Structure formats: C-alpha cells, structure tokens
C-alpha cells in the first residue's frame, strides 16, 4: 500500500509518499509561503531531478492539490493517479488525551478543532489539510497521528500541576508534552540496535532543535517529558524561554505594561538563545559567534547546555538508572559541540562519549566511549515513517 503523510503548518505543507511494501520513500516535498507572496512547491521524487514550481497558493486546499499533481506528473511523478494512494496520515501537534493515532471521523475533527486553543499555530492548519483531502480524495481513509499521544502513558503524578485541581479540570490544564512521535521512533530504533525489547530498557531521548524536549521512557512508555501544557516549557530553546519562575510573568506585565498576548510573544518569540544572545535563534550562529569570543553567545549556549544536563540528570533519577541516551532532531543529530557539551562530566551517570565517534552529522551512529555503562546514540528522527506505520495498521485493522 502507498501512504501519503502530510504535515500542515500555518503557511506550509510537508509531504512524503511511502511504499509500505518496503517502507521506501517514493517522493517528498514542501509547499512554502501559503497565502503570502513568493509561494513555492519543491518536489523531490526518488531517483529523479527535483521540481520547483513558483505559483500563487492561497490556501491549504490548493497546496495539497499541487502536491498531488506533482506526485502524478508525467515527468516528475511517482504514481499514475490518485487511486494509488491507499491512505493519508496527518501529523497533529495537539491531541489532548488521545492515547494513540485514530481514523478521521466527525468526532476526531471536532476534537482537533476544540484543541486549537492549545496549539493555535498547528491544529487549525492540520484540520484544513484533512478537509482538503476529503474534498480532493473523497473516500480515501485518513488517520491522525498526535504528537502528544505517546506522552499519555505518563502517570498522573507526572502530568498533574499543583494548581487548584478544579481549575485544572475546568480548563484541561496538565502536562501534555510534544515531539512524542519522534521520541517513540528513536527509542524503538535504539532498542532494535541493542537487541532488547524497549519494555526492558530505561531510555532518555533528547529531541534537540529550534524547539527542544527531553523524555524519560520506562516500560516502553513516556514516563515524564520536559514540555508541558504547551511547548513553551522545559529546556531553553531557539526563541522559547523554557522553564522560568512563573512570578516573572505578572512582574513583567506590570513593569512593561504587556498584555497577555504581548507577554506570550516575549516568551515564545523573543526569548531562548535569541533573547540571551541578542544575536540569533539558530544554534549554528550561536556556535560561530561563541568561537569569535562573543560573551553573550557563550552565555546563551551554556544556559541551554545547563538546562539539558539538568533534565537528563533528573530523569535518570526518576528512572532509577539509565541504559540508553539518544540524541535526535536538527541540533541533536548535527551539532557535535552540543552533544559533547551535554555529555561532558556525566560519567557519574555512566554517560561518556567517544570524541572520534561523535564526529558525525545527520547519520545513525553509536557514540559511546569504551567502557561506558550507558549506550549513547545519534539517531535521525523519522516521524513520517512512524505516522505511515500507524496509518497502515489502522487502515488494515
């Protein structure tokens, strides 16, 4: 069966078409700048030259139609017609308390819409993508895979905030986490490499990018995770502040006269390594500036590293030990310096990496030093494949 996986953002659509016979990627692509000037489709079929098409793309329906036209194009296409697509899997950032992927029906769409308040940049566009597929490919089964689903295995004491219980119940306030599909994929892959069931392993996965989260995995379930009610919590990130004293929020609102929306912008868009460095939200820029002696870049870097080390140590305590540590996502897969800095002076936990093995970017590799108790890996994430697998399983059930 061929499965199309879609990831609809506020102004973009990413797609991959899988042949599930061998889980190969037949084509992948990206539509950018939906609804704004300069919109473009970049289509990359396996074994063929890429197609770049600049055209007006006013909405997600037009964007998805362009993706499908590229997939069936006489020269750049990889399928003859739409009927070859057996099912469609959608990445949904916020799934509330959905514990697993589900087939799309009216109740699923209603839930995604109601949860838009918790992920305004993501759930709305994803819902528009689902509705576009219903219009263009009527009758084709659709599946929603939720970034939050893997974290629904957390015990209640891990996801509960110590605010008035009634307020939390009324407003659905709890730890939801994010990047769940990525954390689950790399944990399963690491378990496969070491040749043991994930249920028997204590694992910490580090999804490090512009948005970062760390997850403790026990009995093959998420036991705790750094992101919380929203993806603002946890580590210092590219533009997000991560964990701060909550009293800072009303303090700044009073001192600076910020509205709630303005305060949200400060924490989500103007903070993190961008806010500390005053330079950039891109960790590559931070590394380069630090090498040139920029002290605020150094400070931003060290604040980030400190926050990551703190979560790894805390989660090793919660797990009562550690078997596997995994680095993934843009920074985790590609920054030699970030992995080295985070793992430095962690030998008391059994974590020690080999400097030569660590010279890797974007490739799967074990980087454990000889004699280290904890096995450390770099594993490129593959959320799309996880979504495709879930989609296939639900459609065939």
Swiss-Prot record:
Name of the protein this chain belongs to: Acetate kinase
Swiss-Prot/TrEMBL site (Transition state stabilizer) positions: 179, 240
HAMAP family referenced in this protein's UniProt entry, alphabetically: Acetate_kinase
Catalytic class of the enzyme: transferase
List of catalytic residues: 147
Binding site for ATP: 14, 207-211, 282-284, 330-334
Residues given in the record as Mg(2+) binding sites: 7, 383
Record family assignment: Belongs to the acetokinase family.
Localization: Cytoplasm
Assembly and oligomerization: Homodimer.
Catalytic activity: acetate + ATP = acetyl phosphate + ADP
Key word ATP-binding present: yes
Record keywords, A-Z: ATP-binding, Cytoplasm, Kinase, Magnesium, Metal-binding, Nucleotide-binding, Transferase
Cofactor: Mg(2+); Mn(2+)
InterPro entries: Ac/propionate_kinase, Aliphatic_acid_kin_short-chain, Aliphatic_acid_kinase_CS, ATPase_NBD
Keyword Magnesium part of the UniProt annotation: yes
GO cellular component term, pick one: cytoplasm
Function summary: Catalyzes the formation of acetyl phosphate from acetate and ATP. Can also catalyze the reverse reaction.
A GO biological process held by the record: acetate metabolic process
Residues annotated to bind substrate: 91
One Pfam family it belongs to: Acetate_kinase
Cofactor mode of binding and number, as noted: Mg(2+). Can also accept Mn(2+).
EC number: 2.7.2.1
């Amino acid at each position: 069966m061929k499965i199309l996986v879609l990831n609809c953002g506020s102004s973009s659509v990413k797609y991959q078409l899988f042949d599930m016979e061998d889980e190969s990627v037949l084509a992948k692509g990206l539509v950018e700048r939906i609804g704004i000037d300069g919109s473009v489709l970049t289509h990359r079929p396996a074994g063929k030259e890429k197609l770049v098409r600049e055209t007006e793309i006013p909405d997600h329906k037009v964007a998805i139609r362009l993706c499908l036209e590229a997939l069936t194009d006489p020269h750049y296409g990889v399928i003859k017609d739409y009927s070859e697509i057996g099912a469609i899997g959608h990445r949904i950032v916020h799934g509330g308390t959905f514990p697993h992927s589900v087939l799309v029906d009216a109740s699923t769409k209603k839930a995604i819409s109601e949860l838009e308040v918790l992920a305004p940049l993501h759930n709305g566009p994803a819902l528009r993508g689902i509705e576009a597929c219903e219009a263009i490919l009527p009758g084709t089964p659709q599946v929603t895979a939720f970034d939050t689903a893997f974290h629904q295995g957390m015990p209640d004491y891990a996801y509960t905030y110590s605010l008035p219980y009634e307020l939390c119940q009324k407003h659905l306030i709890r730890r939801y986490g994010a990047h769940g599909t990525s954390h689950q994929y790399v944990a399963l892959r690491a378990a496969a490499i070491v040749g043991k069931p994930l249920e028997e392993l204590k694992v910490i996965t580090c999804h490090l990018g512009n948005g970062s989260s760390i997850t403790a995995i026990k009995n093959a379930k998420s036991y705790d995770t750094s992101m919380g009610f929203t993806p603002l919590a946890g580590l210092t990130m590219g533009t997000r502040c991560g964990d701060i004293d909550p009293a800072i929020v009303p303090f700044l609102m009073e001192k600076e006269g910020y509205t709630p929306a303005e305060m949200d912008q400060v924490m989500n868009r103007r903070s993190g390594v961008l806010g500390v460095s005053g330079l950039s939200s891109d960790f590559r820029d931070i590394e380069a500036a630090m090498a040139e002696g920029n002290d605020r870049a150094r400070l931003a870097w060290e604040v980030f590293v400190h926050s990551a080390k703190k979560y790894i140590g805390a989660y090793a305590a919660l797990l009562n030990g550690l078997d596997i540590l995994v680095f993934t996502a843009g920074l985790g897969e590609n920054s030699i310096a970030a992995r080295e800095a985070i793992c430095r002076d962690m030998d008391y936990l059994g974590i020690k990496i080999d400097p030569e093995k660590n010279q890797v970017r974007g490739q799967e590799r074990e980087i454990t030093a000889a004699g280290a108790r904890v096995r450390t890996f770099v594993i490129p994430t593959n959320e799309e494949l996880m979504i495709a697998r879930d989609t296939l399983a639900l459609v065939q059930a």
